[in-house]
Amino acid sequence: MGRLVALSLLGIGLALLGERFLALRSRLKASREVESVDLPNCRLIKGIETGAEDIDILPNGLAFFSVGLKFPGLHSFAPDKPGGILMMDLKEEKPRALELRVSWGFDLASFNPHGISTFIDDDDTVYLFVVNHPEFKNTVEIFKFQEEENSLLHLKTIKHELLPSVNDVIAVGPSHFYATNDHYFSDPFLKYLETYLNLRWANVVYYSPEEVKLVAEGFDSANGINISPDKKYVYVADILAHEIHVLEKQPNMNLTQLKVLQLGTLVDNLSIDPSSGDIWVGCHPNGQKLFVYDPNHPPSSEVLRIQNILSEKPSVTTVYINNGSVLQGSSVATIYDRKLLVGTLYQRALYCEL
């Protein structure tokens, strides 16, 4: 009888593991292949060879790139090279990417930038918020952008127990932000287990010098985050659930879920066109190819444009798709004056004139 019970439990356990494995492949879109949707006036950006995971653009056309991300389980073309922040002036006739100097005293050797966000204060001071993973830990760095010197002055490093696995950040004040945790745990094995079992424990946290609190939870893997031009709504990409969540910002900075937009792809970072409110999304058509890198079958890239997301029938347009022959692993797409920038997790970046 005891052996029968043991065999029954073993069978149930194996069946559960098998079901979870198949479910994970579905969440990763592991069987998806794509056909290219090209744009005519595009070129690869010189000087970006190891990824531009996130991009943020100021109203004056200065674009910031976080480059050189190293992440457990992800391929890297330069595993020993520190990351950095690059800048490109999109108002120039032939814009080029330049690396920004960082103030003395900041640990550049372990700089591993991930999601970024800018904030302009009432006195026109520009702050750059950077999710950083020094030695695969989790911090948010706040810099002051010094345009005359093309440099960043490091102001503050933020660590908190509610920020165990930070992915992206949207600044809402000089020391205030919302951040996504793509996992509940910080330990790599527990992260893997959390993903495999689809526990949906990822969340969004609000940080200010006065308080830090959980404001939204129940995500499979909360990834990109951004805010509407009128500052009333926060958008969160749930990458493994293929969803964008629309959350209404409350006076106390809590978030209330308003709606969920289902998409058939892995949605990464979200960028907002300030003039129209359109959401531009860098996507991964096949997530398995990101983690099992094969140069003969590289990860593909996809850019979506979402219009009128607050309406009953938002418009979703596929702007660009590439099978990896040009661009591998697109993580962000952002627009400025009909100029489109597309960044990737660990490869190149694309500049297009629409």
Curated annotation (Swiss-Prot):
This protein's name: Serum paraoxonase/arylesterase 2
GO biological process, one term: response to toxic substance
Organism placement in taxonomy: Eukaryota, Metazoa, Chordata, Craniata, Vertebrata
Cofactor(s) needed for function: Ca(2+)
Cellular localization per UniProt: Membrane
GO MF terms, alphabetically ordered: acyl-L-homoserine-lactone lactonohydrolase activity; arylesterase activity; metal ion binding; protein homodimerization activity
Gene3D superfamilies: TolB, C-terminal domain (2.120.10.30)
Disulphide bridges, residue numbers: 42-352
Record InterPro entries: 6-blade_b-propeller_TolB-like (IPR011042), Arylesterase (IPR002640), Paraoxonase2 (IPR008364), Serum_paraoxonase/arylesterase (IPR051288)
Cofactor note: Binds 2 calcium ions per subunit.
Gene Ontology CC: extracellular region; plasma membrane
Catalytic activity, EC: 3.1.1.2, 3.1.1.81
Residues involved in Ca(2+) 1 binding: 53, 167, 223, 268-269
Residues listed as glycosylation sites in the UniProt record: 254, 269, 323
Pfam families in the record: Arylesterase
PTM notes: Glycosylated. The signal sequence is not cleaved.
Binding site for Ca(2+) 2: 54, 116, 168
Family assignment from sequence similarity: Belongs to the paraoxonase family.
Keywords: Calcium, Disulfide bond, Glycoprotein, Hydrolase, Membrane, Metal-binding, Signal
Record organism: Rattus norvegicus (Rat)
Quaternary structure, from the entry: Homotrimer.
